[in-house]
Amino acid sequence: MIYLDNAATTLHKPPEVAEAVKNAILTAGNASRGAHGVSLSASRMVFGTRSRLAKLFGCPRADHVVFTANSTEALNIAIYGLFSSGDHVISTDLEHNSVLRPLYDLQTRGVSVDFVPADRQGNIRYEDMETLFRPETKAVVCTHASNLTGNLLDIAKIGAMAHAHGALLVADASQTAGAVPIDMQRMNIDVLCFTGHKGLMGPQGTGGLCIRPGVELRPLLRGGTGIHSYDREQPQAYPARLEAGTLNTHGIAGLHAALKFIEKQTVQAIGAHERALMRRFYDGVKDLDGVTVYGDFSRSERAAVVALNIRDYDSAEVADALFADYDIATRAGAHCAPRMHEALGTVQQGAVRFSFSYFNTENEVDTAIAAVRELSE
């Protein structure tokens, strides 16, 4: 099978990831829940993973790296932890439902939300965002890259704009962490939300958020933390403030191994390889008769994603044919990005998304190009 659905999850991981998970299952105790050897060793591994993530993302403090099950949970913690009735939020049409649905829910609770519109290429105009700020604007919540088109937003520019208006920036790095360099301080990010199972090449069930010192988030969950057990309130210090209950220590061990792999290969090299494959595929399909490709490919810096349609064929039928006849795995449909499909005019048809990873090859890309060519004839 040729797996080209890496924007959903990376199927092929560094071999040391599975080995680390297996070893943790056999040897890891409950981190921060004991003073015996297996608990302490698990605690050291968890803190080591926080430290590697802080270094990777330019987060000023490792203890401000909070673990979650995925980026959806991280975004819910950030969104529900920041906003109250009377606040105003700015977001964009590029967002995933992990941002949209919490914001829609908050609209029913007295929070006002404005969305920066996207054009037919999936781009926004930053001057449109500038006009939306109000005195009560508390934050911009936006993705770093569209999971449908691969277009990047200029996060540093958005963060600077938000800060100039006294607002925060919450960035969703689900599609960029591990493949696009991120520096919270340089890019003016106040809260960075990420998942571990995509570009970071870790196990499913891992993710988190990095929080700039001085940013206060209300806990979404409350419960055991292993510290201050006689207090009725959740501990105030990060990370315990937002980490109630036992962590996914086994998954974090796999993420730790994946981060070591990324450090060795470098984010720059991983991203360059993925984008080269993406560009090879794009160049091979963009001029095919009957094929429509979505997104802006004029910039070299983007996520390694190509979304397309073939004539008026239902995207699900195309994806089914790719898998049944060519053994190529892709993703069809709405991709949890309804506003983006509205902007692109693909609500009814959806789109077929090809997404590339560090472990894909040029031969796999060429096979996928040939398959699209045959289906379009």
Which residue ranges define each predicted feature?
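Pyridoxal 5′-phosphate
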Residues: 1-377
